[in-house]
Amino acid sequence: MSRVQLALRVPDLEASIGFYSKLFGTGPAKVRPGYANFAIAEPPLKLVLIEGAGEDATRLDHLGVEVEDSAQVGHAARRLKESGLATVEENDTACCYAVQDKVWVTGPGGEPWEVYVVKGDADTLAKADDSACCTPRDSGSAGAAVGADCC
């Protein structure tokens, strides 16, 4: 089963967990310091909450499509490249308390999208040094929006 991912940067993680638990009628699947995610069955959605530092309002962090296996990530990467989109591929990257394979693209408005599979748990929210995940936005670089913030 594939599902769309919506990652939000929120000013108050605990309040957001409470709100989204009520909204979707289910608690989070994973809670870690500064991070929570919900695996919502209906509608099929992976909702990711990332605590923002000193932010007053919730904002979009990035979008994604969670797939079942690494082969689907590879297929998406090939399809996206063949369609002319610039891609950034990552394999076995630790991000958002998970080990993932993924491919990033950027929409015309600068919105980062990832197609990814979760392969297991990780001990850290932050990215590896060579990963596009969890990188602060830098409007000065051409590929900055690809994987601009985090998962």
From Swiss-Prot:
Outcome recorded upon mutating Y35F: Retains less than 5% of wild-type catalytic activity
Class of this enzyme: oxidoreductase
InterPro entries named in the record: Cadmium-induced_rsp (IPR052393), Glyas_Bleomycin-R_OHBP_Dase (IPR029068), Glyas_Fos-R_dOase_dom (IPR004360), VOC (IPR037523), YqcK/CadI-like (IPR049789)
Pfam families per UniProt: Glyoxalase
Cofactor: Fe(2+)
Outcome reported for the amino acid change (mutating K102A): Nearly inactive. High decrease in iron affinity
Domain topic, free-text comment: The thiolates of the vicinal cysteine pair (Cys95-Cys96) directly coordinate the arsenic atom of the organoarsenical substrate.
Further comment found in the protein's record: Organoarsenicals are used as herbicides, pesticides, antimicrobial growth promoters, and chemical warfare agents. Arsenic is the most widespread environmental toxin and is classified as a Group 1 human carcinogen.
Role: Nonheme iron-dependent dioxygenase that can break carbon-arsenic bonds, playing a role in the detoxification of environmental organoarsenical compounds. Catalyzes the oxygen-dependent demethylation of highly toxic methylarsonous acid (MAs(III)) to arsenite, which can then be exported out of the cell. Can also cleave the C-As bond in several trivalent aromatic arsenicals, including roxarsone (III), nitarsone (III) and (4-aminophenyl)arsonous acid.
Name listed for the protein in its UniProt record: Trivalent organoarsenical cleaving enzyme
Gene name of this polypeptide: arsI
